[in-house]
Amino acid sequence: MPAARPAGAGVGLVDRYGRRATDMRLSLTDKCNLRCTYCMPAEGLEWLSKQAVMSASEIVRIVGIGVGRLGVRELRLTGGEPLVRHDLVDIIAELRRNHPELPISMTTNGVGLAKKVAPLKAAGLTRINVSLDSLHEETFTKLTRRPFLDQVLAGVDAAWAAGLGPVKLNAVLMRGINDAEAPSLLAWAVERGYELRFIEQMPLDADHGWTRRNMITAAEIRDLLSTDFVLTPDPRARDGAPAERFEVRRRVAGSGAGLGPVLGTVGIIASVTEPFCSDCRRTRITAEGRIMSCLFSREEFDLLVLLRSGASDDDLARRWQDAMWLKPKAHGMDHVGLDAPDFVQPDRSMSAIGG
């Protein structure tokens, strides 16, 4: 068992390896209106009760502690699907009133987004990420088990038009399903000014069917894109970001340099094969108020029970600091590589953690 956080560990959310968490990922709900194959079962998942999930006032208080006392500088709202929460706009508005300069972004599947973009922007949302794995209706429906592609595309366009940019798109490639679509998806994104990020499938599916063999790796993604594009490393500093970014140029046939102008950027998030644990600066709070220092942690620390028992902000801050001090060196274990023989997949799926 790792040693407890020493008294002289300093302020903020620091772990025993010297990393400082400044990026807060907060899940608003475990509920979702899609059933993506790499995240959720087709049927039968039991949602948390309303009482088990943090209320709006509890969310606002926890964020206030993170920002005001513990050095949180960025907030991302996640789910589940945050748009299914009826008080989402009110939550964002209150967070914005309390923290006028805080970047507040949100990850969404985009279903119903077009109708909610204007109030979200007015409330103070800064930026948005939308999950989009395919532009083909049949493939999209196969992956998400719901026929909502048109709604998602409308939401992406509405977010861009409302100024919630840069709009980022997240795509998970599945072998034999949508991997061949990678070049056309990138072409579509850069043409419209969106930043596409390809994400290696992680072992966070509810069915526990993930295998390293079936995953499309970052190296394979680069190879798929190289048929149509030339990728060169983005000169901007990565600064702890999960995505390795590349400038995108169209591959030009014939003599000469063989490069066209820069069309945009693409990101590749290689959590499995090229992990970035040593630079991680994230702290995660689940919808029921539990601290997870890593997506793959099997250990959780309950803030909500403490909060509801009358704990002070100082008490909650100390509990949060103690939890983050125990953050493992890599991937929820003290080794690098999710395909290591002793890796144990967390019980929670991505929807129950918050992406």
UniProtKB/Swiss-Prot annotation:
Binding residues annotated for [4Fe-4S] cluster 2, in chain numbering: C277, C280, C294
Taxonomic lineage: Bacteria, Bacillati, Actinomycetota, Actinomycetes, Micrococcales
GO biological process entries: Mo-molybdopterin cofactor biosynthetic process
Binding site for GTP: R25, R76, T107, K168, R282, T283, R284
Transmembrane parts of this sequence: none
UniProt cross-references to PANTHER family, sorted A to Z: MOLYBDENUM COFACTOR BIOSYNTHESIS PROTEIN 1, MOLYBDOPTERIN COFACTOR SYNTHESIS PROTEIN A
Pathway it works in: Cofactor biosynthesis; molybdopterin biosynthesis
Effect noted on mutating C280S: Loss of activity. Still able to assemble an Fe-S cluster
Ranges in coiled-coil conformation: none
ATP-binding recorded as keyword: no
Record-given protein name: GTP 3',8-cyclase
The record's free-text note on cofactor binding: Binds 2 [4Fe-4S] clusters. Binds 1 [4Fe-4S] cluster coordinated with 3 cysteines and an exchangeable S-adenosyl-L-methionine and 1 [4Fe-4S] cluster coordinated with 3 cysteines and the GTP-derived substrate.
Reactions mediated catalytically: GTP + AH2 + S-adenosyl-L-methionine = (8S)-3',8-cyclo-7,8-dihydroguanosine 5'-triphosphate + 5'-deoxyadenosine + L-methionine + A + H(+)
Residues that coordinate or bind S-adenosyl-L-methionine: Y38, G80, S131, M202
Outcome when changing C277S: Loss of activity
Biological function: Catalyzes, together with MoaC, the conversion of 5'-GTP to cyclic pyranopterin monophosphate (cPMP or molybdopterin precursor Z).
Note: PubMed:8706892 shows that MoaA seems to contain a 3Fe-4S cluster, but it may actually be two 4Fe-4S clusters as was shown in the crystallographic study of the protein homolog from Staphylococcus aureus.
Keywords: 4Fe-4S, GTP-binding, Iron, Iron-sulfur, Lyase, Metal-binding, Molybdenum cofactor biosynthesis, Nucleotide-binding, Plasmid, S-adenosyl-L-methionine
Family per similarity comment: Belongs to the radical SAM superfamily. MoaA family.
